[in-house]
């Protein structure tokens, strides 16, 4: 991550929603750490008590009770340092495949869900016509997630019937992420676009049938 060169982004070869604008190319390393500092990072750092630190203008809570452990791992330190160094300079996203990882640092109110990722903001997020909160997914940018779900992601492929289910159990969580996002989108679209909500719900149902997670219909609103 530190040494990998930053490649140019070509909007013309990307999905349509990314075209028609200029994408600034980040410069410099992701972390301000020197190579010696990186090499010197310890496997774990013990947390004696709950602590709040300011990283790039965002208050991050280091709470053993929230983390479920009384220490930070090296990966946690690198993640937090990247936030400190890059928030406001580079976009910072958390994949939904990491589950509640970012929430364990008290970042829930700063995270805007966009499909399979959650974008970290410097200011707390408030609900609006386009951003809605939903249990299990946090704040979701509904128009953006809808565009990604139906114009970019391969939902039909994920929902394809598999007689033996998803045979590669270690990667099943990726397929489940499709199901969770489409299920949440169905709930968010129930009132504003019932037809698309039904489409998302059918996809979620078909996707979950290929997994061991099962399917739980979203509550009526």
Residues covered by each model-derived region:
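ER/secretory pathway lumenal C-terminal domains and tails of membrane proteins involved
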Residues: 1-221
């Amino acid at each position: 991550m530190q040494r990998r060169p930053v490649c140019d982004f070509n909007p013309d070869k990307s999905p349509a929603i990314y075209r028609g604008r200029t994408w600034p190319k980040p410069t410099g390393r992701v972390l301000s750490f020197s190579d010696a500092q990186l090499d010197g990072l310890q496997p774990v750092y013990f947390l004696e008590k709950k602590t709040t630190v300011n990283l790039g203008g965002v208050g991050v809570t280091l709470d053993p009770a929230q983390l479920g452990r009384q220490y930070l791992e090296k990966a946690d330190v690198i993640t937090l340092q990247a936030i400190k160094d890059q928030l406001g300079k580079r976009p910072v996203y958390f994949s939904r495949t990491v589950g509640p990882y970012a929430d364990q640092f008290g970042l829930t109110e700063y995270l805007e869900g966009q499909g399979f990722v959650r974008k970290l903001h410097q200011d707390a997020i408030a609900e609006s016509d386009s951003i809605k909160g939903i249990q299990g997914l946090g704040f979701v940018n509904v128009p953006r997630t809808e565009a990604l779900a139906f114009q970019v992601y391969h939902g039909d492929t994920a929902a394809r019937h598999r007689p033996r289910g998803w045979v590669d159990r270690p990667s099943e969580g990726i397929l489940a992420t499709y199901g969770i996002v489409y299920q949440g989108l169905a709930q968010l679209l129930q009132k504003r676009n019932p037809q698309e909500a039904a489409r998302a719900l059918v996809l979620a149902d078909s996707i979950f049938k290929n997994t061991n997670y099962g399917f739980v219909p979203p509550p009526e609103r």
